[in-house]
UniProtKB/Swiss-Prot annotation:
The lineage of its organism: Eukaryota, Haptista, Haptophyta, Prymnesiophyceae, Isochrysidales. This is ATP synthase subunit b, chloroplastic. Belongs to the ATPase B chain family. It comes from Emiliania huxleyi (Coccolithophore). In plastids the F-type ATPase is also known as CF(1)CF(0). Keywords: ATP synthesis, CF(0), Chloroplast, Hydrogen ion transport, Ion transport, Membrane, Plastid, Thylakoid, Transmembrane, Transmembrane helix, Transport. It is found in: Plastid, Chloroplast thylakoid membrane. HAMAP family: ATP_synth_b_bprime. F-type ATPases have 2 components, F(1) - the catalytic core - and F(0) - the membrane proton channel. F(1) has five subunits: alpha(3), beta(3), gamma(1), delta(1), epsilon(1). F(0) has four main subunits: a(1), b(1), b'(1) and c(10-14). The alpha and beta chains form an alternating ring which encloses part of the gamma chain. F(1) is attached to F(0) by a central stalk formed by the gamma and epsilon chains, while a peripheral stalk is formed by the delta, b and b' chains.
Amino acid sequence: MHLYTQTLNTVTGLLANEGSFGLNLDIFEANLINIVILGGGIFKLGSTALSESLAERQQKIVGAIQESEERLEQAVTKLTESEKQLAQAQLVITSLKEEAEATAKQVKSGILTDGKAEIERLTASAKGQIGTIEKKIRKEISEYVVTLALQRVTLQLEGKLDVNLQQQIIDKNISKLEG
């Protein structure tokens, strides 16, 4: 505020030193008509240019707003579509999970069933092989026992069996076969 007062005092002092302060109302001497014409022309041309500039700017702003609104609508549409696709994808994922769980249960059940069947088949096969091996071993043991018995009888008969006794045994067996 002090600077304002000081500046006002300085201007007043300068005007007082110059002599007088006043308005020159002589329009020709003061070139007032030219100033008014120039001011009017500037106002007319400036207002037209300013109006055009403002109108152009307004159109750009309106265009930008409309473009933004269109983009917003497109974004909302895309968002809605994306949400629908997400919901569908979640349904598909849920469905796939359920199918996978059901398939896993079926596969597990199938594997267990197949495993049990395979175990039963292997058990039956093993029992059959054991039975076959037992029969083979019994046959071999029987053959061995018969062989040993024949060897023993042969050894016993070699000392007791003469040609007449052998002929009688052969004749008996032949008569049995004929009869």
